[in-house]
Amino acid sequence: MVKAVVGANWGDEGKGKITDMLAQEADIIVRFQGGANAGHTIVNDYGKFALHTLPSGVFYHHTTSIIGNGVALNIPVFFKEIKSITDRDVPMPKILVSDRAQIVMPYHILFDQYEEERLGGKSFGSTKSGIAPFYSDKYAKIGFQVNELFDEELLKEKVYRVLETKNVMLEHLYHKPLIDAEELLKTLREYREMVQPFVCDVSAFLDQALKDGKTVLLEGQLGTLKDPDHGIYPMVTSSSTLAAYGAIGAGIAPYEIKEIVTVCKAYSSAVGAGAFVSEIFGDEADELRRRGGDGGEFGATTGRPRRMGWFDCVASKYGCRLQGTTDVAFTVLDVLGYLDEIPVCVGYEIGGKVTTDFPVTHELEKAKPVLKVLPGWKCEIRGIKKYEELPENCRRYVEFVEEQIGYPITMVSNGPGRNDIIYRESSLKNDK
């Protein structure tokens, strides 16, 4: 049985916590796309961790954590992350790496930085993790799969061939130092030694695991609005952020995915440039940013202050639809307890007309939020375990959002810890 955990919005929704929680019941957790460009923050008995490449299940003894073929694998970051958890008394997790996963090369990170410099004010707000150059090479068929590290002759020929192109760009477009082929080969041989114990045919492993009745959790990165096809293009990432891609990025059949848990925040936040209709500014944004998340709303990868906004029903309804949502996990509800009133974006006004459908980018940039103001609950809700024990206005907020987005909210997160979760029945669950 396969479940996916994915984001409805811009990322930063709290997927790491939800995956960490659901991993208690899973046998295998798979990262199926993206790279070290986005982080998952997890708070558990070992402490607080920001993971970028490792799946969120690495804290459990009973699970196998998998880097799927769809991942952009930065090998040094991967091993630095393993060390960062084992240095804090987390037992060495069981990890497998797909032999078909592709490697983030050292020059991908350089090219990412150089291109952002070249674009200046027209840049895409990259985390400079090498992701766009990595995927450009993957689809230009000049990327390096993990399995290619183990064929010395092939590796050498390919390095020299690829660097012919890269060095022309470095010299004539970016005016930067050239890459030495032998130095790069030396680095790749080091990568080979590091990764060798973990490499296997992940697709075959998962096929057998599913035949054996194992539970598999697919862990997505970022959210619907960062998807290159369905997101706010071009302010998107370079790999699909949708649950549908989980089948491709893990190497399993699409029909195996039975449940899709889409994570929504009780307010909105985003890192990087692009249209953000419900965005707030000034003191109002600073206050929400300071109180938000776990220790403030700052990017887990870059440390950049996140842009803040009210909950966006239009974007979230769209995000849930594209994901194929069976359940919504509604996170960081506890953060809003300081507010007398809570605005919610229920529509977009574009050219004098109001819509509840999420538009394409050039229309989105003209959109103004249509807000409905709900009463706050003005109290602390951490520690509450039963939905009916939440303050009435808090329940009304959850139920209003559920009605607007049209997908069942079956989990409500009211704190950063693994067990700060409230399960609820939803009448929409039976309708889906």
Language model regions located:
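Non-transmembrane, aqueous-exposed alpha-helical and coiled segments at domain scale
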Residues: 1-432
